[in-house]
Design a protein with these regions (language model features):
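Acidic, surface-exposed loops and disordered segments
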Residues: 1-125
Length: 125
């Protein structure tokens, strides 16, 4: 969350088992976060950036190699639903393709060999 929300600015993690948001970082350095996405124009107007990550073992342990594309497919489904919801609410929405992987993994405090960011959506006006 960057600005303009009922939530305080910060980095949050969605817990699907508890259907709740946990705060990971209570504040964000907007310059540092901006540099991850190379100060792209859309970033200046974004209020929220959603970041989806994949833990590949969750699908490959169950499905073997066939499970490798499943996180991408599911992220695409989620992304499409976010686009539809944003459209109905009149909120700007843009999927993000260009970013600095190492910096983002460091910000999220994740090991890129176990969990990897796979889909990003900026929301705002």
């Amino acid at each position: 969350v960057l600005s303009g929300s009922d939530l305080e600015p910060g980095l949050y993690h969605y817990s699907p088992t508890e259907h709740a948001l946990d705060i990971l970082l209570p504040s964000l350095d907007k310059k540092e976060v901006s540099s991850i996405w190379m100060s792209q124009r859309w970033f200046r107007k974004s209020s929220i950036i959603l970041i989806m990550t994949a833990v590949y073992r969750r699908t490959t342990d169950k499905y073997g190699e066939k499970g490798l594309p499943f996180p991408f497919i599911e992220a695409g489904h989620i992304g499409q639903n976010i686009y539809l919801l944003a459209q109905s609410l009149g909120i700007g929405c843009c999927a993000i393709g260009q970013f600095k992987e190492k910096q983002l993994c460091k910000l999220l405090d994740i090991n890129p060999f176990e969990e990897y960011p796979i889909y990003y959506i900026a929301l705002g006006n």
